[in-house]
From Swiss-Prot:
SUPFAM superfamilies found in the cross-reference section: ATP synthase (F1-ATPase), gamma subunit
Membrane topology: Peripheral membrane protein
Keywords: ATP synthesis, Cell inner membrane, Cell membrane, CF(1), Hydrogen ion transport, Ion transport, Membrane, Transport
Species assigned in the record: Aquifex aeolicus (strain VF5)
Major localisation: membrane
GO function terms (MF aspect): ATP binding; proton-transporting ATP synthase activity, rotational mechanism
Cell compartment(s), UniProt: Cell inner membrane
Complex and partners: F-type ATPases have 2 components, CF(1) - the catalytic core - and CF(0) - the membrane proton channel. CF(1) has five subunits: alpha(3), beta(3), gamma(1), delta(1), epsilon(1). CF(0) has three main subunits: a, b and c.
UniProt name for this protein: ATP synthase gamma chain
Record's function text: Produces ATP from ADP in the presence of a proton gradient across the membrane. The gamma chain is believed to be important in regulating ATPase activity and the flow of protons through the CF(0) complex.
Family: Belongs to the ATPase gamma chain family.
InterPro entries in the record: ATP_synth_F1_ATPase_gsu, ATP_synth_F1_gsu
Gene3D superfamilies from the UniProt entry: 3.40.1380.10, ATP synthase, gamma subunit, helix hairpin domain
Length: 291
């Protein structure tokens, strides 16, 4: 490798400084988006839990054995809903959840189960379509401004219809989820068949239904399924901003380290250049004296 001149080193340092400004700006933006996304996460969780609790209450009143959404079947065909990000520059955020999905797919295929994918987020869609996986539907640009509930509803409807029609025997939902305010990890859940823990009748109080209990129960179950996909997208969105904030913070710190290292190299090169010039001047003076 050719030795760099002080001018080249200075140009390199300036390039690193420019990169540092970009990564620092991205960190600040991600931190601001993270605060809003976390507010949505912690607002959505109680609603989701109450919906699940309500389904459990109602399950004590209706015969779930006759509801096809509760039908547990032998796995021959499986659908996987995978939520990833639309963008990169978020560390291992996308690769970890994609690896989790691949492990599940491999496990099922080794047992002779056919796996179909519904992919929410550009990164997952690009990854699995390029590798020839069986992709039923893919969505991108779903996290551009806010989490799109219509996409969540459509995804839930697709897998619900496939389950009811017998095209799939089980549906899994995979996404990154915030574990604490400062950590996240991939989660795998069974989306269908639906499982609800029946609540004791004593806890229920009295319900008066304007429609049949079965109709109301079906409505609440469908609402819950829609919201589960939405919540997975909300959790993933918050985790993405957190991952990007950390990645950009690390990139900024690495840039600072590089600037310090190259500054030392620059100072050394400049000192060597000055020393060389002084030696040349001294030699020239001595040569003149010799004449």
């Amino acid at each position: 490798m050719a030795k760099l001149s002080p001018r080249d080193i200075k140009r390199k340092i300036q390039g690193i400084k420019n990169t540092k400004r970009i990564t620092n700006a991205m960190k600040v933006v991600s931190a601001a988006k993270l605060r809003k996304a976390q507010e949505l996460v912690y607002a959505s969780r109680p609603y989701s839990e109450k919906l699940y609790e309500l389904v459990g209450h109602l399950a004590a009143h209706v015969d779930t054995e006759d509801n096809p959404l509760f039908d547990v079947r032998e796995e021959r065909n499986v659908d996987v809903i995978l939520v990833t990000a639309d963008r990169g520059l978020a560390g291992a955020f996308n690769s970890n959840v994609i690896r989790t999905a691949e492990n599940l797919i491999r496990e099922k295929e080794e047992k002779g189960v056919k796996v179909s994918l519904i992919l929410v987020g550009r990164k997952g869609f690009q990854y699995f379509t390029k590798r020839g996986y069986n992709v039923i539907k893919g969505y991108d640009e779903v996290f551009r401004k806010t989490v799109n509930f219509n996409v969540a509803k459509e995804v839930a409807e697709i897998v619900k219809e496939r389950f009811l029609n017998g095209e799939t025997d089980r549906v899994y939902l995979i996404n990154n989820e915030m574990v604490t305010r400062a950590s996240y990890k991939p989660q795998v859940r069974v989306f269908l068949p639906f499982e609800a823990q029946e609540k004791e009748v004593e806890e229920l109080g009295t319900y008066e239904f304007e429609v049949s209990e079965e109709e109301f129960f079906d409505y609440i179950v469908n609402l819950y399924l829609n919201y589960q996909v939405y919540r997975a997208m909300v959790e993933s969105n918050a985790a993405e901003h957190f991952a990007r904030m950390i990645a950009m913070d690390n990139a900024t710190k690495n840039a600072e380290d590089l600037i310090r290292q190259w500054t030392l190299v620059f100072n050394k090169a400049r000192q060597e250049a000055i020393t060389t010039e002084l030696i040349d001047i001294t030699n020239a003076v001595e040569a003149l004296k010799a004449q």
